[in-house]
Amino acid sequence: DFKKDNKDENIDIIGQFGVGFYSAFMVADKVTVISKAYGSDEAWQWESSGADGYELEPAEKETAGTDIILHIKPDTETDNYDNFLDEYGIVAIVKKYSDYVRYPIQMEREKSRQKPEPDPKPDDYKPEWETYTELETLNSMVPIWKKQKSEVTDEEYANFYKDKFSDYADPARVIVSRTEGTANYNALLFVPSHRPYDFYTKDYEKGLALYASGVLIMEKCADLLPDYFSFVKGIVDSQDLSLNISREMLQKDNQLKLIHNALEKKIKNELHAMLANDREKYESFWKEFGRQLKFGAYSDYGMHAELLRDLLLFWSAK
């Protein structure tokens, strides 16, 4: 009934009707939900194995809220479900897929610290250590690409780029783009200062990391970049994309095409600004990626030549 009543409503909750909950059965053979409404004296337990219906019964719960308990499947020859019970495995999963969800994802973690030194300290004193548990927020929550460019330093952008894309050098250019209207998205793009070792090989994969409201849905979405800008690295986050959209659906998604076109123009304008305002840096960029721009102008029967012509450099005797 809830789904039917709110079918046409703009509900801004990730996975409200599917992926966020039903994906639990991908790793659990049973799911238990215990919930108590604020101001209520009653709590209820819902339990299902994901196949034949569910069981609903009264439960005991001291505080208001909802607990979701996953009964993780046993390991198989092909799947290691124990990874979802491993502390470091959980941290890695949260960092990869939900680092930028705007709500805190917290977990109790076991840590160690040195015990306070006695006073006075005996001559034969040796430091002692103790273990303790601490509730730690695992995700960053506020993505850097949603901040105003004036709020982020060049060093912060460079550190984010090097950490996210495993590069040792600062980017040649940082491109911040956000649009509301026909296509709603935030994008943070980087023009590398050097080409990857495999850039001109068939093994190189172009694409931008694609997020839906802070949740990673594709590590490298090739459809967001034209081939002649395949060197660009970055992230696109859109609230208009479904969390469970498939690769096939993405290729036909009109929002993705709008974002592609907007980013293409933005990248072109930023490169042209670099050429006009920092010729030395642009020439360094050209040595790394100029061949790709020339190929873009030549390929597809010169279809993109008009777009790229202002970015091309040629040797001259003058």
Walk through the language-model features, giving the residues of each.
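GHKL (Bergerat-fold) ATPase N-terminal catalytic module, capturing the glycine-rich phosphate-binding loop
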Residues: 1-84, 92, 115, 316-317
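A short, contiguous, amphipathic alpha-helix enriched in charged residues
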Residues: 1-6, 150-172, 212, 307-317
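Conserved, well-folded catalytic cores of nucleic-acid-processing
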Residues: 2-5, 27-37, 71, 97-104, ...
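Short flexible coil/turn linkers enriched for glycine and charged/polar residues
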Residues: 7, 50, 61-64, 99-100, ...
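GHKL/Bergerat-fold ATPase module
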Residues: 61, 79-81, 102, 118-148, ...
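A short amphipathic beta-strand at an alpha->beta junction
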Residues: 101-113
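Extended, Lys/Arg-enriched charged tracts that mediate electrostatic binding to polyanionic substrates
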Residues: 154-196
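A contiguous, basic/glycine-rich beta-loop/short-helix subdomain that forms a polymer-engagement track
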Residues: 195, 206, 280, 284-318
